[in-house]
Amino acid sequence: MASLLKSLALFKRAKDKPPLAAGSGGAIRGIKHVIVVPIPGDSSITTRSRLLDRLVKMVGDPDISGPKLTGALISILSLFVESPGQLIQRITDDPDISIKLVEVVQSDKTQSGLTFASRGTSMDDEADRYFTYEEPNDGEERQSYWFENRDIQDIEIQDPEGFNMILATILAQIWILLAKAVTAPDTAAESELRRWVKYTQQRRVIGEFRLDKGWLDTVRNRVAEDLSLRRFMVALILDIKRTPGNKPRIAEMICDIDTYIVEAGLASFILTIKFGIETMYPALGLHEFAGELSTIESLMNLYQQMGELAPYMVILENSIQNKFSAGAYPLLWSYAMGIGVELENSMGGLNFGRSYFDPAYFRLGQEMVRRSAGKVSSNLASELGITEEEARLVSEIAAYTSDDRNNRTSGPKQAQVSFLRTDQGSEAQHSASKKDEARAPQVKKETRTSSKSDKHKEGTDKEPVSSSAMTLIDVDTTLEADTDPLESKKSAEALLRLQAMAGILGDSTLGNDSLRAYNDKDILN
């Protein structure tokens, strides 16, 4: 049996192992297309700022071609380094494109103010065709995207500090787009705006230079559809991370934005480890989880073997990303999601509408959190040197804070997964219907007694009795159907108040000549 388990472990490890780079053939190369990337030909800040101005206007042209747009974005992304050409040549290794670097210098003879550097050959016409676009023949003004503040005419500047701030503002908006461009481009605007506000408050960017929505949409769509552009951006991030010592301010900002980019598309895998395994609840000992725990273990080993590219496998469209999908461990993932929605309010907005989602194991995770609230892990307590008396004190404090948290906030998590509680809801509805049948004769009896005692007030007497009785029944049914322990205390207090009120109103209709005065003290007593 031991040999079988050992063979099983080796089999799972070999199954999830990526293929090794071996064989007699060379690297497979695709049909390449040429990408022209303009780079500054001198160290002048005027040249760089003028090139940045022309490139931003080019990107805002709705009719720009895809390869030209990619080249312009690569040029903008590399403008913050001292030698953009060396950077691009060092980090670019793409089988789909061939990058052609073109040096740009200032010129007074061209319409754009820039020309391509060459030896003895005039490239003014080629530079104008590249940096400018023709107006339509019908005389209408051509639409182009620019900054939201239309008062900004150009961004040419001669001050190095000011140029770095403007460049950082533009680069921040481009890098923020990468976080959601592949996984959720349609719902990315809200999160992108939050990050923009963050960097504005930190004075890393200039708020007045917020780019137009159309400009950002154009870049987001290009990032989503162009794998070569994403490869360059990931390679640039990794190159910045490998740089020793202090980094330029723009480089540090890119690393900060990388925290939102890294592990994009791997939420199922990361959250399963975080909530399903790291919480170490005893439910992990179930036989149903044995196979999936082995799968998670092999995937974690595979993740480590992939090295520094592992967090970007979805952005880079690596085919191995399918192995990390939640469909490979559906029971453990459903269990982890149940734990997550109980521990973190931010998990309540997740979409659980997957075909492999299992509601039973989702509720298992919820119940593990609820019933384990305030308990101390014996293994962890022994490692930390916590005594039994200290563990008991921690349990009491944790139970108190848990009750206080439940009373203060019900949270969005139960509202998001209410459809999963079909069993509890049906049982509560069944018990409520039985109580309705038992109370119905009593309600009818009270109504007949009221009508006999005072016939000339038949309408006025019947109305409060039936209203109070039906109100009591409806409230009982509703509160019994709601078995959420997060609101049990409030529900009990509300039920006592409503029962006392209904009793007062019912007693006033049982033939007494003088109506009983309503007083809050009766409810409190």
Curated annotation (Swiss-Prot):
Region Interaction with the phosphoprotein: start-end pairs: 477-505
Location of the region described as Ncore in the Swiss-Prot/TrEMBL record: 1-403
Bias type Basic and acidic residues, positions: 433-464
Region span, Ntail: 404-525
Keywords for the protein's UniProt record, in alphabetical order: Capsid protein, Helical capsid protein, Host cytoplasm, Ribonucleoprotein, RNA-binding, Viral nucleoprotein, Virion
Subcellular location: Virion; Host cytoplasm
Chain residue ranges for the region called Homomultimerization: 1-36, 373-391
A Pfam family matched in the record: Paramyxo_ncap
GO cellular component terms given for this protein: helical viral capsid; host cell cytoplasm; ribonucleoprotein complex; viral nucleocapsid
Positions contributing to RNA binding: K180, R195, Q202, Y260, N351
InterPro entries (alphabetical): Paramyx_ncap (IPR002021)
GO molecular function, one term: RNA binding
UniProt function note: Forms the helical nucleocapsid (NC) in a ratio of 1 N per 6 ribonucleotides, protecting the genome from nucleases. The nucleocapsid (NC) has a helical structure with either 12.35 or 11.64 N per turn, approximately 20 nm in diameter, with a hollow central cavity approximately 5 nm in diameter. The encapsidated genomic RNA serves as template for transcription and replication; encapsidation by N is coupled to RNA synthesis. Forms the encapsidation complex with the phosphoprotein protein P. Before encapsidation, the newly synthesized free N protein, so-called N0, is chaperoned by P.
Recorded domain comment: Ncore is globular and carries regions required for N self-assembly and RNA-binding. Ntail is an intrinsically disordered monomeric domain in the C-terminus.
Subunit structure: Homomultimer; forms the nucleocapsid. Binds to viral genomic RNA. N0 interacts (via Ncore) with the phosphoprotein (via N-terminus); this interaction allows P to chaperon N0 to avoid N polymerization before encapsidation. Interacts as N-RNA template with the phosphoprotein (via C-terminus); this interaction positions the polymerase on the template. Interacts with the phosphoprotein; this interaction leads to the formation of membraneless organelles that function as viral replication factories.
Record family assignment: Belongs to the paramyxoviruses nucleocapsid family.
Protein's name in the database: Nucleoprotein
Organism: Rinderpest virus (strain RBOK) (RDV)
